[in-house]
Amino acid sequence: MKKTPLFEIHKELGARLIEFHGWSMPVQYTSIIEEHKAVRNQCGLFDVSHMGEILVEGPGALESLQKIVTNNVARLKKGQVLYTPMCKDDGGIIDDLLVYCLGQDKYLMVVNASNIEKDFNWVRDNSNQRTEVVNESDNYALLALQGPNSKKILEKVSSVNLDSLKFYNFTTGTLKGAEVLISRTGYTGELGYELYLSPDKAVEVWQALMEAGSDLGLIPAGLGARDTLRLEKGYCLYGNDIDENTHPLEAGLGWTVKFDKASFIGKRALLKYKEEGLSRKLVGFKLKGRGIPRHGYPIKDNGDQIGVVTSGSMSPTLSEGIGMGYVRYDKATPGESITIVVRNRAITGEVVKLPFI
């Protein structure tokens, strides 16, 4: 099993470690609810070094990326970040990822841990000959500092001017002598920063951040809280809410598909879905009774199955069962009453507009 550069720190902190896509990762340190609330109200620090980084560069890099992803990479200037799906010919989602514009003809794709090898092969095989594609995943550690106090904490240990750093923009600077790419991005819906750095500097930077945040409510946070935080904001998780059998339009990601772009992989299939209409849609829902919806639970209407839960949890913020799932398109309107089958119990739920908070 792979270990991040912070593995020993997680053990020292008493984290509960689990196997996650071939990595030993901290799912929680104290409790998911405590870590979740810290991120919403103060700050949390996550080790997400299991994520993958793929460098795409050369005179053909932009042309290759425009063909490979659905969003418009051409609009990126140096220092900007783009969220985009990457689709197959049939519109199915290979992965959802971030594209960083490092400079002219130089981009970094940040991909899900479960898909690194698959994505690397796909990007390499579908790039033109004037593009070099390199799997740089082993050369990066990735820390996510998330929560309302994240800016104050980061300013204590870095000389970078964060006032001018806008959402989905990044800059570079030094932190405890380490060269760091500081990105104003995250998976929590809070003010936050993601820090890309050399693996051999990860421990030093983690400790510096924890020390700087000691009087600002900073605590380490695991993958459990990361999941409940993203769910409350209605963010998709690859492998749960989206995969190769779902497409961006039904997943509520239509805003990332730029049909006015020249041809890209999946464009024809997605255009057909757009013209013919959707048969199902990813929705958010709340339970009206006690229970926790989980991935794979049936969604019914008058006894007929109309969909399936893709993500679900007890919301630490709302203290009620929330989830996302695909339902038949005619049942996807907020306010619709549905039934979730939780451990053979039928619990009434209601379709709601995302995000939950």
From Swiss-Prot:
Subunit text: The glycine cleavage system is composed of four proteins: P, T, L and H.
Similarity remark: Belongs to the GcvT family.
Keywords associated with the record: Aminotransferase, Transferase
GO MF terms, alphabetically ordered: aminomethyltransferase activity; transaminase activity
Enzymatic class: transferase
Catalytic activity: N(6)-[(R)-S(8)-aminomethyldihydrolipoyl]-L-lysyl-[protein] + (6S)-5,6,7,8-tetrahydrofolate = N(6)-[(R)-dihydrolipoyl]-L-lysyl-[protein] + (6R)-5,10-methylene-5,6,7,8-tetrahydrofolate + NH4(+)
Protein known as: Aminomethyltransferase
Gene coding for it: gcvT
